[in-house]
Regions:
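Composition-driven recognition of glycine/serine/threonine/acidic- and proline-rich low-complexity segments
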Residues: 1-135
């Protein structure tokens, strides 16, 4: 007989750990894990006083010890560019108060998370809603 689960209230479900698709270190020295296969999530382990930013709505969960601040990300010009392209008008900064603080980000649609390290002054053009998080 194969082992399976029934729909019984209170039954424990021993689900497998999520697949870790990719691990690495950011340019700022934080470690990250890309979890999952189809609907991936990025889990960052932030260093003390490290700040990252994302568009509004991309954060899935965060641990205690992270301050959150919403801003326009560069003034009126940047705000207008994002409005014209249909992106979120506001950016959210997350700053870790201490070492080893976890925060996770995910997309609203299926796809792969690809880390891209950009040198100062380097830029990339990506499709709408492809941006997830940056340092």
């Amino acid at each position: 007989m194969t082992e399976g689960y029934t729909n019984v209230a209170g039954q424990r479900l021993d689900l497998p750990d999520p697949t870790v698709a990719l691990t690495g270190t950011t340019m700022g020295g934080s470690t990250y894990r890309v979890m999952g296969t189809v609907m991936q999530a990025l889990v960052l382990n932030l260093k003390a006083r490290q700040t990252i930013y994302t568009e509004s709505g991309a954060m899935s969960w965060m641990a205690d010890g992270i301050d959150m601040c919403t801003n326009t990300g560069g003034g009126l010009g940047s705000l207008l560019k994002r409005a014209v392209t249909g992106e979120s008008l506001f950016l959210v900064d997350y700053t870790s108060e201490r070492d080893n603080t976890l925060i996770a980000f995910s997309s609203d649609f299926p796809g792969k998370i690809i880390p891209v390290n950009l040198a100062p002054g380097q830029s990339i053009i990506a499709q709408k809603e492809a941006f997830l998080v940056a340092e």
